[in-house]
UniProtKB/Swiss-Prot annotation:
Its main location: plastid. Keywords: Plastid, Ribonucleoprotein, Ribosomal protein, RNA-binding, rRNA-binding. It comes from Epifagus virginiana (Beechdrops). One of its GO terms (cellular component) is plastid. This is Small ribosomal subunit protein uS11c.
């Protein structure tokens, strides 16, 4: 049987760039999604295209340590470090997690000027019935 010749331009032969390469944007939007189990931080440009992202799980925190404020702070600094030269940013925070304040502290400590901070946590207008309360 003849050996298969790889097609030039196929995905195996193309060098895929690393996720940690640096991007240059002047103004962006930082989306923060916090829960009690994890924190996800995504940096987008004005049009909404994701430039970089990070989470507490990708930073090496496993299990219950992903939900801590320190893990959220590390995730925010890793997501912002990839974007070089971003001067102004809008922050959208979603969710009830512990890491909300820690993410804001990390963003302000990185030198990015915050134009506004918006809480976009979805609130039901008496929608679905919530799950029953836990009895421990």
């Amino acid at each position: 049987m003849a050996k298969a010749i790889p097609i030039t331009g196929s995905r195996r032969n193309v060098h895929v760039g690393s996720r940690k390469s640096s991007f240059r944007i002047q103004k962006g939007v930082i989306h923060v999604q916090t829960s009690f189990n994890n924190t996800i931080v995504a940096v987008t440009d004005i049009k909404g295209r994701v430039v970089s992202w990070s989470s507490a799980g990708t930073c090496g925190f496993k299990g219950t340590r992903r939900g801590t404020s320190f893990a959220a702070q590390i995730a925010a600094t890793n997501a912002i470090r990839i974007v070089q030269g971003m001067q102004r940013a809008e922050v959208m925070i979603k969710g009830p997690g512990i890491g909300r304040d820690a993410v804001l502290r990390a963003i302000r400590g990185s030198g990015v000027l915050l134009t506004f901070v918006r809480d976009v946590t979805p609130m039901p207008h008496n929608g679905c019935r919530p799950p029953k309360k836990r009895r421990v």
